[in-house]
Structures are given as C-alpha cells and as structure tokens.
Amino acid sequence: MADFFSVQDISLCLGGRQILDHVSFSVDTPGRVIGLLGPNGGGKTTLLRAICGELPHDGHVFLEGAELAGLRSKELARRVSYIPQLSGISISMSAIDVVLMGFYPKLKLLSQPSADMRAAALRALEQVGMAGLADRDYLTLSGGEKQLVILARTLVEDTKLLLFDEPDSSLDLGNKYRMVRMIMEL
C-alpha cells in the first residue's frame, strides 16, 4: 500500500547554494501531525515551499499516490494548503474576505461566494475566536489576529495536506495553546 504522503530525494539550490540535499520522508496515514525541526536557516521553510510547488526542485512529492508536480495549480490548491509565517496579503480586504479566499479552488474566477460559503467562513472565524472581527480590514489586525484569520481560511479550504510554517509565532500564550489544539483536531 502506498504512503499517504511522501517526499523523495528533494534537492534545491538557491543562489548557487545547496539548501536541500536529497531530503526524503513519508507519512503512512492521514491525520498525522508531523513537525520539522532544525536550526534557523536550515531549509525548513524552503522544503515546505518546494513541497507545495512554490519553488522548483529536483525530486518527487506524492500525495495519495499522485505526484504533485503533475497537477495543475487549481488541482494542487484543492489538495495542499501552505500556511506561511507571513500571509503575504498586502491589499485592503475584510477578514471574512480573506477567509473566503480559501474557497478559491472551488469558485470560478471572479465569481461571488454563495451564502453557504459566507456562512462557512463566518463559522470558521467563530471557531478561531475572530468572528467579531469579520468585517475589520485585515491589514489593521495584529500579527496574532492575522494568523488566526489565516487558520480560519485553512479550515474552509478542506484540503488533504496542511503545511504550517510556524503557525503560532505571533500569538500570545493562550492563543498558541488554542492554535495547537485546533491543528491537532483538524
């Protein structure tokens, strides 16, 4: 039986420097929480970005037996969610609109989200304790609030593989605990 998820011989050079050198590992069953540990600058973020297709690399990544490199970006987005340390969102939009971005793979370009999608987005914001900020401009939120909104977006994406890059780095102690608990429940 094939592994649920496997990384085989991932190698990557950036700026002439070898960042990843034949990295391999596998996860046999879904629902597992796996951590990548290593020093600052050790390539953890680079590996996550390579796995989700953001960085070109040598080697192979498989999810449920399908090689991710062969998938179109929309199909890849249906299967894999990457949650970076910083969201990269730099345009003014409400917190609920950020969460609604999680439905992108299921929406046609420029289509309006349905009432059901809006309700699901609001439930996700409620789940992470941010429902009261649904209409606030995302750019005005604190770093921790932004991370919780991004977690809410991840909840509506409903993908098979979630890749978190330091998801609790901007959170206070209480929200760190809540974030870890929510990740374990996904």
Question: What spans do the regions from the language model cover?
Answer:
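Conserved ABC ATPase signature
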Residues: 137-141, 145
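The feature captures the beta-strand-to-loop junction immediately N-terminal to the Walker
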Residues: 36-39
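Conserved structural motif at the start of ABC-family nucleotide-binding domains
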Residues: 5-7, 20-22
